[in-house]
Amino acid sequence: MEPSISGHAPAPARIRSAGHWLRRELLPVLALLLLLGTARASFANHYHVPSGSMQPTLQPGDRVAVDMSAYGVRVPFTRHVLIERGRPQRGDVVVFDSPADGTRLIKRVVAVAGDRVELRDGHLSINGVPMADAADPQAERFGPRVARLDLANGGGPDILDARVPAGHVLVLGDHRGRSVDGRWFGFVPVDALYARALAVYWRSGDGLGWRRL
């Protein structure tokens, strides 16, 4: 009697075939997802603005594109810098971890290491030079950048005289009277800066766009 011939491959062959399919089809997809996740954690991301502390520059609910490699390429999900790049500059809008409780915030760098800072009635002076824009007292000029201020609720606490220590920056909100910022939690270590904000890419009522910061 001749053995019967089944139309199905033997079980070991089916297992080998399934394993080959997984390696050929699934592993590249997993590798791509891992690559995208790593890129998101190390290079580009977005931030959802939770409050009005940066008005009028940023509105509550704004979606902001950020460059996570602006100050260095890090090991994903850590503060360890693999490749150093730029240093924070006055006027940069940055996302960082609060020294007080680790909450992720977005504010403006107004002073860097070595700067002497005074803030009176919401108006900033760096190294004895007022930052107010000559054409608009409700704005401050940081080189080519102009930051619009909201002083409708006053300027908040003053800074009478302070010097930024090495490896740190001072951050303030553009809405000076309603911002919990460096006046409350002190100077921010540079390695706590998570990203530099590039642009608002979505705003309620306006929809998609690219409003550069």
Give residue spans per PLM region:
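Soluble "head" domains of membrane/secretory-pathway proteins
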Residues: 2-25, 38, 42-213
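Single-pass alpha-helical transmembrane signal-anchor segments
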Residues: 29-39
